[in-house]
Each structure stands twice: as structure tokens, then as C-alpha cells.
A protein has these predicted regions:
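Acyl-donor-binding surface of acyltransferase catalytic domains
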Residues: 1-29, 144-145
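Helix-loop element at the rim of GNAT/NAT acetyltransferase active sites that forms part
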Residues: 24-26, 34-43
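A conserved beta-strand-loop-helix scaffold within acyl/acetyltransferase catalytic domains
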Residues: 46-87
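Short acidic/polar active-site loop segments enriched in Thr and Asp
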Residues: 77, 113, 136
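Conserved acetyl-CoA-binding loop-helix of GNAT-fold acetyltransferases
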Residues: 86, 92-105, 109, 128-132
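Conserved GNAT acetyl-CoA-binding A-motif
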Residues: 107-118
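Conserved beta-strand-loop-alpha-helix junction that forms the acyl-donor binding cleft
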Residues: 117-127, 144-147
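Conserved acetyl-CoA-binding loop of GNAT-fold acetyltransferases
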Residues: 131-140
């Protein structure tokens, strides 16, 4: 698992296009559906709902359709992004980059100065995305799952 971090200033130089990214809490039904499509279980969504402090879902709209979803929460000066899912038909169009920028703007509005995200080593596309938007690996961990 890679843990990426960057200053919110790195990602707040250009706002996402109008009516493309929405910070919403509680999450809309379409967001929960997109999380489910991406393998994010109800149990994980329930963990997001229990988070204390500032939190938001981010709904991405692209080509006039729901395109992706993510979750962000702030603790102190750190914002953490989780559960980023982009619909397969909307990938390779910059949606995830804009979603991360929206997360950074939202985080800055909450007083955060850092944006962080964890990503499995196996997720080549997401690792490339986070590097391409200026995030740096600041740590990592390995875990085993019984199965």
C-alpha cells in the first residue's frame, strides 16, 4: 500500500469545470450505487458515515452523466481521500484528476493544508494518477488478509 500526500496548494490552482464536481453530504443514492459498482461495500460506506468531523462525498459529473465518486474527511490539517471510483466508461478523460482537485478545494475550505490518499501497489492506474497530479509517496504498509 502506498500513502501519497501533497499540499492542497498543489491542487488548488484551477477549479474543476462548472457543474462537474459536487461536494455533497450525506452521499446521494447514485454515489452509493457507484461505490457498490466499484466494490465498496455498505460496511465501508457505514464507516464513512461514522467519521467525526468535516467530511464529504464528491460526485463527479462528466459528459452529462454521473462519472465517479470519492470520499474526503479532515482531521486537523490533514485531509484524507478514500473510495475513489470512476465508472469504466468515463475513465481516461481526466475525471479522477478533477475529483482530486475538488477534494483539495474542499479540504482547503475546511482548513486542511495536506491532501492524502492510500493506494494499493497493484492499482497501476491510480498510482500513475496520484503521481501525475504532484502527489508523492510518503509511506506505505503491507497487510495480509485471511482467506
Amino acid at each position: 500500500m502506498n500513502i501519497y500526500s501533497t499540499s492542497v496548494d498543489t491542487l488548488t490552482t484551477e477549479r474543476p469545470p462548472k457543474v462537474s464536481m459536487f461536494s455533497v453530504w450525506p452521499p446521494l443514492a447514485i454515489e452509493i450505487d457507484m461505490w457498490a459498482e466499484g466494490g465498496i461495500s455498505d460496511a465501508r460506506v457505514n464507516v464513512m458515515k461514522r467519521v467525526q468531523g468535516p467530511k464529504t462525498s464528491i460526485l463527479a459529473r462528466w459528459n452529462d452523466h454521473p462519472a465517479g465518486v470519492g470520499f474526503a474527511a479532515v482531521h486537523g490539517k490533514n485531509a484524507f481521500v478514500h473510495a475513489v471510483e470512476i465508472r469504466s466508461t468515463q475513465r481516461q478523460q481526466g475525471v479522477a484528476s478533477w475529483l482530486m482537485k475538488q477534494a483539495a478545494f474542499w479540504a482547503a475550505e475546511q482548513g486542511a493544508s495536506r491532501l492524502n490518499v492510500a493506494c494499493t501497489n497493484a492499482n497501476v492506474a491510480a498510482n500513475a494518477l496520484y503521481r501525475s497530479i504532484g502527489m508523492k509517496v510518503v509511506g506505505g504498509y503491507h497487510y495480509r488478509m485471511k482467506g
